[in-house]
């Protein structure tokens, strides 16, 4: 039978939060005896918005805003029951989106 693995994908607007969360997940998994591959930084998604400064005229005058979405990917190979329980109880910051696939 193939080795079981857990794939964790993290998304956040702040790279410091995502790196801190990735470090907590890696430490928790290693403490319970699982092998961790990653965190692998995935490409940052940049969404840009152009807004007219004036409500009436001056089409050439615009403000530009952007949202950067940072992503990290990690695999936990051969997780034990203790690993899964520890990951479920882990308290991560509010700005981090966690996606777990078994």
From Swiss-Prot:
Domain of life: Bacteria
GO cellular component terms, semicolon-separated: ribonucleoprotein complex; ribosome
Gene Ontology BP annotations: translation
UniProt keyword DNA-binding present: no
GO molecular function, one term: structural constituent of ribosome
Pfam families reported for this sequence: Ribosomal_S10
Keyword check for Ribonucleoprotein: yes
Keywords: Ribonucleoprotein, Ribosomal protein
Role this protein plays: Involved in the binding of tRNA to the ribosomes.
Subunit structure as annotated in this protein's UniProt entry: Part of the 30S ribosomal subunit.
Record-given protein name: Small ribosomal subunit protein uS10
Organism: Methylobacillus flagellatus (strain ATCC 51484 / DSM 6875 / VKM B-1610 / KT)
């Amino acid at each position: 039978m193939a080795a079981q693995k857990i794939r964790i994908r993290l998304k956040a607007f702040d790279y410091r939060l995502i790196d801190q969360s990735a470090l907590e997940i890696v430490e928790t998994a290693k403490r319970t005896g699982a092998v961790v591959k990653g965190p692998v930084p995935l490409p940052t998604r940049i969404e840009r918005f152009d807004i007219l400064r004036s409500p009436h005229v001056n089409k050439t005058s615009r403000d530009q805003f952007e949202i950067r979405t940072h992503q990290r990917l990690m695999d936990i190979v051969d997780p034990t029951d203790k690993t899964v329980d520890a990951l479920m109880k882990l308290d991560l910051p509010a700005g981090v989106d966690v996606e777990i696939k078994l």
